[in-house]
């Protein structure tokens, strides 16, 4: 393991024992810090409106998928504790296969797999599906897009 070379004492191969340099090796990513500030500035005035929009879409998606035989929604929470993200599995498909079909045949983008949390899938029972299909909705997601996803999954599960 190699380490050392700080912004305050570049020739010293030991990490500092005191101060912020102990935890912050290298230069701060000022461009990302500035971008984060701008993102907050742009989204903050609409935050409540965006959250309500996401929750409306979430209800539409949850209601639509829950009526399809063989689809299991994971991690359902009370709406007031939810954001525009929903994970599900289908008993006829592994998550990667379903994601690929949705992409190639329906032009719908979802995230599939273990989502950087492989051990959680043992707990939620999605290992046999190769993880989950995760849908993320935001400001620019439309009800039409959510309905298209529901209809695509329904069509695939009825084949």
Locate each region found by the language model.
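Pyridoxal 5′-phosphate
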Residues: 1-159
